[in-house]
Amino acid sequence: MHVRVRLFAMQRELAATREVALELEPGATIESAWDALVGLNPLLGPGRAAVRFARNGAYADATDVLEEGDELAFIPPVSGGAPDSEDTPGRDTRSGAGAARRIIELRATAFGPAILDDLADRLATPADGAVVAFLGRTRETPGTPAPGQEVEARRHAGRAVDELEYEAHETMALAVLGTIADEIAARFGVQRLAIVHRLGAVPLGEASIAVVAVSPHRDAAFGAARYAIDETKARAPIWKAERFEDGHVWVGAPARTGPADVEG
């Protein structure tokens, strides 16, 4: 049985390749595919505790049995972590909460200065009285290194970040963002939402993510925007490297494969 493994971020660097073809016995599981990969690339082995699995573009369990031609991704720690608040504002169930509109994008080019206004204009209807927008920017202060990156982080301790660089499993990332939008509609009743994320190099002070939630009422819009950014950072297969003059550090935490209050 033949399967294809795609490698990203720190795994890609450790293995010095973006893709590996594996030949496995019939009935092999995702876990056994990981073991075979580590057999070919032993440097990947210490990262097992922080790895999450994906099969054909969706999160999967280590015990899932593989089929001929499957595409696997062993997801290293993603760009963010779990939310720092468990507040859950109310759901918008009042009139005018319909008319679903979504903007889910990954962009390789810089955002314009009016991106939040542009997104709000594309989403809002006459029934909407609330627009909540979030813009994430590159800061000079380093973040928390991903598991396995601690030594490299210490080498750059005390230095300012020059720029960020983002990498993604693009088709899977778009699917995860769409799922997050579905959850927002179910939890908060917010049907008009934008999540736009940069890829590639993002210099100091430039924006890397824009989130806009539009609703008739503010409580639902605030909750939707917060949920969108927290879940994107925790679950989307998007990786972030902090770049310095003489090297880089991958930052983040092991990916969550579902909502924090459901994953168990």
Walk through the language-model features, giving the residues of each.
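Short, conserved charged micro-motifs
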Residues: 29-32, 219-223
